[in-house]
Amino acid sequence: MQFKITEKIKNLEIDDIKENLLHYSYDSKTLKALVKKNTSKDEVSYITAYSSFVGEIYENVIYELLLKYTLEKDEIKSFVLKGPYQAKENHFIKSGLLIDRSSQIVYKSAYKDISEFDALFFTEDSLYFVEMSTSKKTASLNKRLAKKYALLKIIFPSLEIKALIVLTKGSTGIKNFPSYATVWLTEDLSDDNLIEKIIFAKKVKNDLQTLKAPENKKFIEAYSIKYKKFPYFPTLEWILNICRKHPKFEVDLKFFSSPKMSLYFDIYTKLYIG
């Protein structure tokens, strides 16, 4: 099925979640310093820092709106908590699907970050990963989807993997997204008072649960999810060993043409066989 955007999300109606946004951790150090120096808003350094900061807030806005959206949609069976909603048990998980130090949903293998997800939710037979961006150019985002899709396909082999992409109006390249992706378009985040308030808000510690999700069994913790482990480095070693076992050729090219290997190629962006 394809989830449809609501008017509330499309128009970024956030009056009821503004206080919640102050509970998230932000990297405001650079922007705060520029504001204190009265740096011109036309300076490249200011524009870059401001755009990045607004992108952080936008991600949290959409996440908050998706929490409410989840309660409205019977098709959504579970939604992964992160940020100020996560339980302290998540901090003891060091590998696999977890919440990292910056309160993001990531997959780690031997302390290596494989992929990061802005949000994850499950339906009866599918897993949706959510990506949010305020950049009007979507080429790099589109390119990153393949790795995320491949990883989730490996660790959740029985589920159909889909993506929900949330962008702002005026974004380009929307028709270039893969068929498994649903694209939502919202208004730009332009609440200057809110943005300024968050810039100078007291820094929040990532390891504290300061908000409580609504009492609903749909909301789940990352540490409770069952999935198939993906050992990043042992798998890489296995690929390198198997591809050399052809009786006639130094490299078995046919081995690389299997469907499973196509998923691995999306995860291992560079593979050198010397």
Model regions and ranges:
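Intrinsically disordered, low-complexity Ser/Thr/Pro/Gly-rich regulatory segments
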Residues: 1-274
